[in-house]
Amino acid sequence: MVLIRVLANLLILQLSYAQKSSELVIGGDECNINEHPFLVLVYYDDYQCGGTLLNEEWVLTAAHCNGKDMEIYLGVHSKKVPNKDVQRRVPKEKFFCDSSKTYTKWNKDIMLIRLDRPVRKSAHIAPLSLPSSPPSVGSVCRVMGWGTITSPQETYPDVPHCANINLLDYEVCRAAYAGLPATSRTLCAGILEGGKDSCVGDSGGPLICNGQFQGIVSWGGDPCAQPREPGVYTNVFDHLDWIKGIIAGNTDVTCPL
């Protein structure tokens, strides 16, 4: 009963900046209940994020999703009518690229969470593998989350929405957003003509390109889904050594520059 009450009544507030620490998918459709067993729902400080289950003890999300009193729910589809196999966890440890937990819009927006106890695999809970090859521009990607489905007005759905978008050349994002450096550890993804995008409430969730987990929802334009204003995603492949090192117990491993 406590779990049902929490899932049904938690409020979703928007961050005061353009980062998608509460983003939903614009222009998508309801995800199939069986297509996202790795997708986790993260609540903190009255905000929400997404995340990805890597194994029974570890979740990968965005650094800007860090907050107090974090709760992590696995096996969720409908927030109003929870699956019977929903599980709740809290962080045991959090790991960031920088010990000061700093990040920018183009670097280090990534956080590994070790759960307080292992997750039990079930019909709606299963991990997603890390990528075996780097992302390729032009790939069709799947983005998903419980973020708002309208922008700038916010409408939050009961179930996660999914949308297919394209992995774009990084220069498209540089043209859209002043201040992005010539190179970064991010990916640029969206639809050039607009209409589909991750948005407020989707942050931390996965970007899956050609079947591989390549990105973490980070930030984008405001309003969301505008023409030639794609979303910016943390590049998972670029951080593989750091992710694998932390999970293996090597806390001295460093993130790529």
From Swiss-Prot:
Its main location: secreted. Disulfide bonds join C31-C162, C49-C65, C97-C255, C141-C209, C173-C188, C199-C224. Its EC number is 3.4.21.-. One of its GO terms (molecular function) is toxin activity. SUPFAM superfamilies: Trypsin-like serine proteases (SSF50494). It comes from the Eukaryota. Keywords: Disulfide bond, Fibrinogenolytic toxin, Hemostasis impairing toxin, Hydrolase, Protease, Secreted, Serine protease, Signal, Toxin, Zymogen. Negative results: does not have activity on gamma-chains of fibrinogen (FGG). Belongs to the peptidase S1 family. Snake venom subfamily. This is Beta-fibrinogenase mucrofibrase-3. It comes from Protobothrops mucrosquamatus.
